Amino acid sequence: MADKKGSNSEKLLYCSFCGKSQHEVKKLIAGPSVFICDECIDLCNEIIRDEAAGAGIEAGLSKSDLPSPQEIREILDQYVIGQERAKKILAVAVYNHYKRLKHLDKKDEIELSKSNILLIGPTGSGKTLLAQTLARLLNVPFVIADATTLTEAGYVGEDVENIIQKLLQNCNYEVDKAQRGIVYIDEIDKISRKSDNPSITRDVSGEGVQQALLKLVEGTMASVPPQGGRKHPNQDFIQVDTTNILFICGGAFDGLEKVIVDRTEKTGIGFGASVKSKQDRDAGEVLREVEPEDLIKFGLIPELIGRLPVVATLGKLDEVALMKILVEPKNALVKQYHKLFNMERVELEIRPAALQAVARKAIRRKTGARGLRSILEQALLDVMYDLPQMKGISKVIIDDNVIDGDGKPLLIYEDAPKVAGSN
C-alpha cells in the first residue's frame, strides 16, 4: 500500500502503516519500498516512551548501579539551591530505602525497617521540590497529598486511602510499581492535635487523621476502588501493600521553634551553660535542635513520630540564595522566561539589580522561592501581552524599577539602536 495511481495518472504515495495519502499528512518518509507518515512516527515515539518509562521503574530499583548518596546529592544540587544538610540527610535515607528494597528477596535474619522522612521548614524553602526531584531521579511513581483535605473514614472529605488511589493512577494502576513509589504528604503540621487535653468532641481532621495515616505509613493493605470509582460494598477492590512505599511528610511547623527554645532554655540553666539570646539564633538554627518531644508538644502523636525516624530541617532562604534560585538550577525561572521570549525571537535581559529586587520582594512577602514566579509574572505581564502584536523588537530589558512597579520594560528595536518604553 505504498503507492497508487490517481485519476490524473499522478502517482500518489501512501503511508504503509495507517494508509493515509501524502496529501492527508504533513510529511511522508520513504524507506526501502515502504513509507511512514509523521503521525505514525509520533505514535511510535509515544509507545516507546511509555514502555521505556515503565521498564525504567523496574530497572531503576533492581539494577546494581542504584545512585550512591553522593550522586543523589549532586543531582539534587542541580535543582535545589542551598539546604545542604537536608539534601545530605535525604540522599542517605532514600539510598538506604531502595537498597533495602533490592535485598527484600534475600533471606536474612536481620530485617531492615523502613525509614520514612519528615521535612520541617518554612514555606517556599524547597520541601516539595526535593521530594519531586528524588522521584524523578529514581523514576518511580510519585504523588503529592495535602494533609489539610484529609478526614477520618466516614466523614466528609478525603479518605487517607485516596492517596494510594492517586499513586495508582500515576502508574496506570500497576500495583507492583505503586508499591515502590514515593508519597509526599504536605502540610502535615496542620493536622496536629488541637489540644493536649482529650476532648469529648471528635477531632476528625487532626488526631483522627494522624491515626489513619499511621496505618498507611507503617504498612497496611489499602483497599482502593478500581479506576477511580467510589467505594461500594459490592465491588472488588485493588489491594495495595504500603509497606515499601516511601512516605515523606513536610510542613512549616510555625511556632515549633518557640517549643524548642522553651525546652533548651530549661535544660541550659546553671554554671557553665552556654547562653545565647533568641536574637542571635535564626529559626533554621533552632529547628536543627528539634527532638521528638518537641513534635509531641506541637501536636503530633508519638506513634506517627516514631514512624518518621529521619528528620531533615530546612532553613529560610536569604536574598543571595533566592537570587541563585532565579538563575542557577536546570529549570531556573529566568531560563524559562528566556525560552518563552526566544519563541517570539526576542532576547530577554533581566539585570542583576532586577534579580535582587525580586528576591527582596519575596522576602518581604514571606513566600520564599514559591513567590518568585508570581513576582516575575507580574513584572512581565504587560510586555508578554503586547509582544506578539509588536513588530521589530529584538530585545526586552528588565531593571529593578520594573520589579518595584516604578517603571516599564525597555524595548530595543531592530531597525534603530534606540531604547523606548513599552506602551
Curated annotation (Swiss-Prot):
Q: Which UniProt keywords apply?
A: ATP-binding, Chaperone, Metal-binding, Nucleotide-binding, Zinc
Please name the GO terms of the biological process aspect recorded for this protein, alphabetically. Answer: cell division; proteolysis involved in protein catabolic process
SUPFAM superfamilies attached to this UniProt entry: Glucocorticoid receptor-like (DNA-binding domain), P-loop containing nucleoside triphosphate hydrolases
What CDD domains does the annotation carry?
A: RecA-like_ClpX
Ranges for domain ClpX-type ZB: 3-56
Give the domain of life: Bacteria
Q: Which residues of this UniProt protein bind ATP?
A: P122, T123, G124, S125, G126, K127, T128, L129
Database matches in InterPro entries? AAA+_ATPase (IPR003593), ATP-dep_Clp_protease_ClpX (IPR050052), ATPase_AAA_core (IPR003959), Clp_ATPase_C (IPR019489), Clp_protease_ATP-bd_su_ClpX (IPR004487), ClpX_bact (IPR046425), P-loop_NTPase (IPR027417), Znf_CppX_C4 (IPR010603)
Binding of Zn(2+), residues: C15, C18, C37, C40
Entry GO terms, CC = HslUV protease complex
Q: Name one GO molecular function term.
A: zinc ion binding
**How does it associate, per the subunit comment?**
Component of the ClpX-ClpP complex. Forms a hexameric ring that, in the presence of ATP, binds to fourteen ClpP subunits assembled into a disk-like structure with a central cavity, resembling the structure of eukaryotic proteasomes.
| Family under the similarity heading | Belongs to the ClpX chaperone family.
- Please explain the role this protein plays, according to its UniProt record: ATP-dependent specificity component of the Clp protease. It directs the protease to specific substrates. Can perform chaperone functions in the absence of ClpP.
What is the name attached to this protein's record?
Answer: ATP-dependent Clp protease ATP-binding subunit ClpX
Taxonomic lineage of this organism?
Bacteria, Pseudomonadati, Pseudomonadota, Betaproteobacteria, Burkholderiales
Gene name linked to the record = clpX
